[in-house]
Every structure is written in structure tokens, then in C-alpha cells.
A protein has these predicted regions:
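Short polar/acidic secondary-structure junctions
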Residues: 14, 23-25, 169
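Short acidic-hydrophobic, aromatic-tinged amphipathic segments that line or gate anion-handling sites
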Residues: 6-10
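Generic structural signal for short, solvent-exposed loop/turn connectors between secondary structure elements
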Residues: 13-20, 37-39, 122-126
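Acidic/polar short surface loop at catalytic or gating sites that assists cofactor/ion binding
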Residues: 1-3
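Metallo-beta-lactamase
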Residues: 19-114
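C-terminal regulatory/interaction regions
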Residues: 115-200
Length: 200
């Protein structure tokens, strides 16, 4: 069936006692519906007890840049941690009331995954695809987007924190390397490649 949109909702809007809180990351449109007087929140897939929701890399809309989904997600999680959510009704699983503990658990698991990404990266310059292969081996078609999204998300996060440097080669491919490592690639690439540092 085709549904008609009666009303577009935006950050800080309210309806029927609910407050709209935009929490992008897991998906660009993730939203909390916070009912403070009722003491509960519809959290959807933003936080789920016992699950580490993975932000999937998505193609940007025409004229827009792709957003760093994992960085967005962590920012949204830190915001969510301090909201008075009360009882949470997620998109999957059972309701829960310990949202601070759930948020902290997700953030802890992401830090552990950062270490796995760094271990897979080693001291060489690698692409996100190469890191995903080192982490997951042969990926099925169904797991491909998940595995590559994990690699891209954590590489972007580590670059954002100043741990990695990143540059784009003349084919448009992104490469990442630890900042404390000399320039070494996992395999030979053309000497005409330019790095972000050399352009600046």
C-alpha cells in the first residue's frame, strides 16, 4: 500500500506527548520518540540491548557528501546517554530500562573493534576493502556490505581521532595508514600517486 505523509517531523517537534529527537548514525533518519511524562521512549534500532547496531555505509543523495556514519552514531550515542529515556522500546528484542548501561556496552564494543581494525591494518597502507578482507576473510555476498561498512566506519573514526592518515590515489581509492608508520603499501602502487600530505 502507498502511504501519504501527513506531516514531516523535525528535531524538537512534539506530538501526542512525544518529543522528536534525531539520532543519526545507524541510519541517517534514526529518531527517538521520547515521552517524558509517560516515562518511556520508542528507540527503534538506535539502541538494542545485547546488540551492537552497525552503521551501514550509504550512498549520499545527489549533491550531498557521504556522512561518516560511525562518527555520527557515536555522537548520537553520547547524546542519548544523558537523555531521560525511561523504559525503552527498541525495534528488536525486549523493552529495557537501563539505557545508560546499554549505550556504554555499545561504545565499549566499538572500542574493541577499533583495536581489531588497527591490528588488521598493521603498519602498511591499506584500503578499507583490504582491511575488511584481513578481518573477515572470504566474505559472502550477504555479508559484504556489513564487513566493508565496519572497516570504513572504524577507519574514518580512527582518522577523526588523529590515529590514522588518509589519502586518495589517482584512481580515487582511499588509503589509510597509522601516523607513526613510514609510507609502506600492502602491494606496489604507481609512483604517480598523490597523498593528502603532498597536496597540502
Amino acid at each position: 500500500d502507498v502511504c501519504t505523509v501527513d506531516r514531516a517531523l523535525y528535531e524538537h517537534d512534539s506530538f501526542d506527548g512525544f518529543r522528536v529527537v534525531h539520532v543519526p548514525g545507524h541510519s541517517p533518519t534514526d529518531t527517538l520518540y521520547l515521552h517524558e511524562s509517560g516515562g518511556f521512549t520508542v528507540t527503534g534500532d538506535h539502541i538494542i540491548q545485547g546488540v551492537n547496531p552497525n552503521p551501514i555505509v550509504r550512498r549520499p543523495l545527489p549533491g550531498q557528501e557521504r556522512q561518516p556514519s560511525l562518527i555520527q552514531y557515536q555522537q548520537s550515542l553520547l547524546r542519548t546517554r544523558y537523555l531521560p529515556l525511561g523504559k525503552c522500546y527498541p525495534g528488536h528484542g525486549q523493552p529495557f530500562s537501563n539505557h545508560i548501561e546499554v549505550v556504554d556496552h555499545i561504545l565499549e564494543r566499538q572500542e574493541k573493534r577499533n583495536e581489531k581494525v588497527l591490528n588488521a591494518l598493521g603498519q602498511e597502507a591499506q584500503t578499507p576493502w583490504m582491511v575488511a578482507q584481513r578481518m573477515y576473510g572470504n566474505m559472502s555476498a550477504g555479508d559484504f556490505i556489513f564487513c566493508v561498512s565496519v572497516a570504513i566506519g572504524h577507519l574514518e573514526l580512527l582518522e577523526h581521532r588523529g590515529v590514522l592518515r588518509c589519502w586518495r590515489d589517482h584512481h580515487g581509492v582511499l588509503w589509510y595508514q597509522r601516523k607513526n608508520a613510514g609510507i609502506r603499501h600492502a602491494f606496489i602502487i604507481p609512483e604517480t600517486e598523490t597523498t593528502r600530505e603532498s597536496v597540502q
